[in-house]
């Protein structure tokens, strides 16, 4: 009689087989997150390239916006749908386009296509970082950090227009189109004086400063200079081993500033914290603008400036500039309103 000791092999189902295939070690990792990331990224990029190459914005903005119409890579864009479409998702098979691809493009359907697939593609990329971090057994701080640009994208391209009258007021996907949106934000929301924008700027520029300082410091202490040191020694090292020293770096910055990071974990957490928090705060500010919340309005200065021609501050000057942006921009930017301003109400500078 034969006695078998041990557990019988469990029958593997389709889920286990799919899990094995998705998470197999290959040149480009797919994973479960890839089921969301790869198709969404493909469609978002494909829709964007199709839009800037072939699709006009004549029916939505009264503009030329494609290479086919003579735009270059700075002025081409995938434009938002017209204001009359409201917050329609503009499905190709929906009541607006009714399955007609040409009409769908004319109505701005590519914008919602790119925006929604782009948002899910970014989320898929964050999930990819979670998944690979779990596989190689490291902490998921990369994914947490990547949530910051996702928050900015979702707040600017989705939440803000949802708070306004339609997708029309979101940024179009293009370089010059984004610049137009920035001017719009300043003129209509006084965005640069918003404390959340200030925190965002402090976070991004502070992160750039920290990155430059950190890179230079590590490069400075990575190799030990001998008598033959010169400016380009760091790029042509002759040492067998690196000589990086946190203690030396700490001594250097203690002498420069009087303070320095005491350990690597605190230093690198701070480099993570500054830009991520700045972007999160900026995204929160844009959500506020979606609800048309105002930030700093120094009404007392505006009243005094209106009463006293000799009283002016940089704030009151900026308020006048914002009024100029609105007056000059609105008629061109919102053709559906059919705005006509009499010549005498349009502000003109000395050069005009």
Swiss-Prot record:
The terms describing its cellular component in GO are: chloroplast thylakoid membrane; photosystem II
The record's listing under Gene3D superfamilies reads: Photosystem II protein D1-like
Residue positions annotated to bind chlorophyll a ChlzD2 are 117
Catalytic reactions on record: 2 a plastoquinone + 4 hnu + 2 H2O = 2 a plastoquinol + O2
- The entry marks the following residues as binding Fe cation, namely 214, 268
| Annotated binding of a plastoquinone, by residue | 214, 261
Q: What else is known?
A: 2 of the reaction center chlorophylls (ChlD1 and ChlD2) are entirely coordinated by water.
Quaternary structure note: PSII is composed of 1 copy each of membrane proteins PsbA, PsbB, PsbC, PsbD, PsbE, PsbF, PsbH, PsbI, PsbJ, PsbK, PsbL, PsbM, PsbT, PsbX, PsbY, PsbZ, Psb30/Ycf12, at least 3 peripheral proteins of the oxygen-evolving complex and a large number of cofactors. It forms dimeric complexes.
Return the protein name: Photosystem II D2 protein
Tell me what organism the protein belongs to: Oltmannsiellopsis viridis
């Amino acid at each position: 009689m034969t006695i078998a000791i041990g557990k019988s092999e469990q029958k593997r189902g389709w889920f286990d087989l799919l899990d094995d295939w998705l998470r197999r070690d290959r040149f480009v990792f797919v994973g479960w997150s890839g089921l969301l990331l790869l198709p969404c990224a493909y469609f978002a990029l494909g829709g964007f390239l199709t839009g800037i190459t072939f699709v006009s914005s004549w029916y939505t903005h009264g503009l030329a916006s494609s290479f086919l119409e003579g735009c270059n890579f700075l002025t081409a864009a995938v434009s938002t749908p017209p204001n009359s479409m409201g917050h329609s998702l503009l499905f190709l098979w929906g009541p607006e386009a009714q399955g007609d691809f040409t009409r769908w493009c004319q109505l701005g359907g590519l914008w919602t296509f790119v925006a929604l697939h782009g948002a899910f593609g970014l989320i898929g990329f964050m999930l990819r970082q979670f998944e690979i971090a779990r596989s190689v057994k490291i902490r998921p701080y990369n994914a947490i950090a990547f949530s910051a640009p996702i928050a900015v994208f979702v707040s600017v391209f989705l939440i803000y227009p949802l708070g306004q009258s339609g997708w029309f007021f979101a940024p179009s996907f293009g370089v010059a189109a984004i610049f137009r949106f920035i001017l719009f934000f300043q003129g209509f929301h006084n965005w640069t004086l918003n404390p959340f924008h200030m925190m965002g700027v402090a976070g991004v520029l502070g992160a750039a400063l920290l990155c430059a300082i950190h890179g230079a410091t590590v490069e400075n202490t990575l190799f030990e200079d001998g008598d033959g040191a010169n400016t380009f020694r760091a790029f042509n090292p002759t040492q067998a081993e690196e000589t990086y020293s946190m203690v030396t770096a700490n001594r250097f910055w203690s002498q420069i500033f009087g303070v320095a990071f005491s350990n690597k974990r605190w230093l690198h957490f701070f480099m993570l914290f500054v830009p991520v928090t700045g972007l999160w705060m900026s995204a929160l500010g844009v959500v506020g603008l979606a609800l048309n919340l105002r930030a700093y309005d120094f009404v007392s200065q505006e009243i005094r400036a209106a009463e006293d021609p000799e009283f002016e501050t940089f704030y009151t000057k900026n308020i006048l500039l914002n009024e100029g942006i609105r007056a000059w921009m609105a008629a061109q930017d919102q053709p559906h309103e059919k705005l006509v301003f009499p010549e005498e109400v349009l502000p003109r500078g000395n050069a005009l």
